[in-house]
Amino acid sequence: MDEYKIIAVDFDGTLCYSDWPALGDPNERLIAYLRNWRDQGNKLILWTCRAGKALEDAIAWCRDQKLEFDAVNDNLPEIVEMYGNNSRKISCDYYIDDRSVLPEAVGY
């Protein structure tokens, strides 16, 4: 997958300043960055704990922001083919999540 990079991005607290299950204001700077990223031929995965109607609402909210995804809560088909399985963990180059932390930051 050298021809493009993959970002998996969270919804609540990352793309959308929300109080689950309500929808809130967009993180406009991040959304603009991700639209540009995808316009350059890279891939985006929406990676969220939302399911059912809450997930449908989040996807519609993203479309209203002109933000489209190559996959939602799933690996890209080419990744599944490359590895021969569909791991529960999303395979990507970068994870963007308001609850993420680098290993060095946990103080071990």
Where are these regions (language model features)?
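HAD-like aspartate-dependent phosphatase fold
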Residues: 1-108
